[in-house]
């Protein structure tokens, strides 16, 4: 078994420059933090198709902010057997703010850029998972941790020494909130 490979995709500046991470194994892939805006999600779909031919099995969300899950719809539509997940405490944060955010964000970015009904993740109750074909490379959920919210999940790939960190680490810019 080859080690898991990780790739990143940066969204547009309009989409708050959020980073989406794709982890690809021998027989399956998983995506972390789908983007905020529909055009960015459509770009992610094309990027995944260019990057790998293995099926996308799941999409995970690091925390409850909309720029990390709002436009999962086009991605899940492209891979209809894929599921959207988050740690239970992340799902609780999404539930707490969902109705308000669904009304607010289209007023700023336009209804053409924000899904009318963003899909909500289902709670992932486990501390790790494995991709088919790469059972020797677990992906471990760490959290809740403090990122730019108090309910952040990091995803640790110990064999590959990779961390998917969402908004717990910043590089070239400061987050808007």
Predicted regions and their residues:
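Short catalytic-loop micro-motif centered on adjacent basic/acidic residues
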Residues: 30-33, 57-61, 140-141
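Signal/transit-peptide handling
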Residues: 163-177
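Short Gly/Pro-enriched turn/cap motifs at secondary-structure boundaries
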Residues: 11-13, 117-120, 143-146
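Active-site HxH/HxHxD metal-binding segment of metal-dependent hydrolases
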Residues: 46-130
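Active-site environment of divalent metal-dependent phosphoester hydrolases
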Residues: 17, 37-39, 64-69, 91-94, ...
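Short Pro/Gly-enriched beta-strand edge/turn motifs at strand-loop
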Residues: 1-9, 109-114, 134-139
């Amino acid at each position: 078994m080859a080690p898991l490979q990780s790739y990143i995709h940066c969204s547009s500046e309009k989409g708050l420059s959020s980073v989406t991470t794709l982890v690809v194994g021998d027989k399956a892939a998983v995506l972390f933090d789908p983007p905020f805006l529909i055009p960015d999600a459509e770009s992610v779909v094309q990027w995944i198709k260019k990057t790998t031919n293995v099926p996308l099995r799941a999409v995970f969300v690091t925390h409850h902010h909309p720029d990390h899950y709002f436009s999962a719809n086009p991605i899940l539509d492209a891979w209809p057997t894929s599921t959207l997940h988050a740690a239970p405490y992340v799902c609780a944060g999404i539930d707490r703010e969902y109705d308000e955010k669904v009304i607010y964000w289209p007023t700023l970015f336009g209804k053409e850029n924000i899904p009318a009904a963003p899909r909500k993740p289902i709670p992932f109750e486990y501390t790790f998972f494995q991709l088919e074909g790469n059972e020797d490379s677990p992906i471990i959920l760490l959290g809740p941790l403090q990122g730019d919210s108090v309910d952040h999940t990091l995803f640790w790939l110990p064999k590959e020494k990779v961390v998917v960190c969402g908004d717990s680490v910043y590089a070239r810019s400061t987050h808007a909130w």
